[in-house]
Amino acid sequence: MGQSTLIRAKVGDRFSIGDGCPLTLFGGPCVIEGEDFSLKMAESIAKVCDRLGVQFVFKSSFDKANRTSIGSFRGYGLEEGLRILERVKTELGLPVLTDIHESQQAATVAEVVDILQIPAFLCRQTDLLLAAAATGRTVNVKKAQFLAPWDMKNVVNKLRQGGAENLLLTERGSCFGYNALVVDFRSLPLMRELGCPVVFDATHSVQIPGGAGDRSSGQREFVPVLARAAAAVGIDALFMEIHENPDQALSDGPNMIRLADLEATLRHILRVREAVAEPIGASA
C-alpha cells in the first residue's frame, strides 16, 4: 500500500472512516431488545458522540445465530429487527449496522443498513462474503478467533473480487486455549496493510466463550484498558456493545459496558489517540 494512498471506507453518503477522519464508534446493545429501548439507546449514545466529536454508527443484531445454548434469547428476527433498525435510521438520522449469517439475507438487510457485518465465525464463508459484496454496501468483517491477521488477505480478496469497495476489518481477540481470548495488537497494523481501515472490538475481546456453562461470560472491567491500548496502537473505529443495565441484558451482558460509563471511556480513548497522532502501520 503506497504511502500516498488514503485508507478509507465510506459509510453511505454520510461520512468516511479512516485516514484523516474522526474516530468512529460502532455501538449499541448486543441484540435488539425492543423498539423503544433501541431508539432510547441510539439517541443516548448519539448525544455522547456528538459532544465528543465522534462519528457514530448504531449497532444491534436482529438474530444471534450462534448463542451457546438452544434456550438463549436470539432476537426479534429479520423482518421485525429490520423494521426497528429502519426507525432508528430514519427518525434519529443515524447510520446503522447489523450482522448477517446467511447469504440470502444480504440483499434484504442491505436495503436498510449502511454497513453489513460478517461475524467472526463466518468470515471465511465465500458465498456469504460474495453476497455481501454484491450489495454495494460497506462491509465490516470480524477476524475469526482462529485466524492470523495475515490470513485476512484472503477474506479481503474474496470481497474485492465480488465487487466490494468499502471494507473494514475488525480485531476481536484470538483463542488462547479453552474458554479464553487474548488480543494480539499487532493485528491492527498488519490488517491495515491490506488497505482497509481497522476496527477494535473492545467488548467481545473480553468475552469468556462458554464461561458460564450454557452461555458466555466476560470481564467488562477490562474493556477500557484494551480500548486505550488499541487507541495507542492505532485504530480507525471502535466497536463497543453498550447497555443501560448490562446485568439485565438479553445477550452478552458480562462484556457490555454501561451507558453511564460511555462518555468517560471515550474521553480517555480520545486522549490516547490524540497523544499518538501518527499514521498506523507495522513499520511506523
From Swiss-Prot:
Keywords: Cytoplasm, Lipopolysaccharide biosynthesis, Transferase
GO biological process: keto-3-deoxy-D-manno-octulosonic acid biosynthetic process
GO terms assigned for molecular function: 3-deoxy-8-phosphooctulonate synthase activity
EC number of this enzyme: 2.5.1.55
Keyword Phosphoprotein included in the entry's annotation: no
Pfam families xref list: DAHP_synth_1
Pathway(s) annotated for this protein in UniProt: Carbohydrate biosynthesis; 3-deoxy-D-manno-octulosonate biosynthesis; 3-deoxy-D-manno-octulosonate from D-ribulose 5-phosphate: step 2/3; Bacterial outer membrane biogenesis; lipopolysaccharide biosynthesis
Catalytic function, reaction form: D-arabinose 5-phosphate + phosphoenolpyruvate + H2O = 3-deoxy-alpha-D-manno-2-octulosonate-8-phosphate + phosphate
Superkingdom in the source lineage: Bacteria
Keyword Cytoplasm attributed: yes
Compartments it resides in: Cytoplasm
Main location: cytoplasm
GO cellular component, one term: cytoplasm
First-tier enzyme category under EC: transferase
Gene3D superfamilies: Aldolase class I (3.20.20.70)
InterPro entries, per database record: Aldolase_TIM, DAHP1/KDSA, KDO8P_synthase
HAMAP family in alphabetical order: KDO8P_synth
PANTHER family for the chain: PHOSPHO-2-DEHYDRO-3-DEOXYHEPTONATE ALDOLASE (PTHR21057)
Similarity remark: Belongs to the KdsA family.
Annotated protein name in UniProt: 2-dehydro-3-deoxyphosphooctonate aldolase
UniProt organism field: Synechococcus sp. (strain ATCC 27144 / PCC 6301 / SAUG 1402/1)
Lineage: Bacteria, Bacillati, Cyanobacteriota, Cyanophyceae, Synechococcales
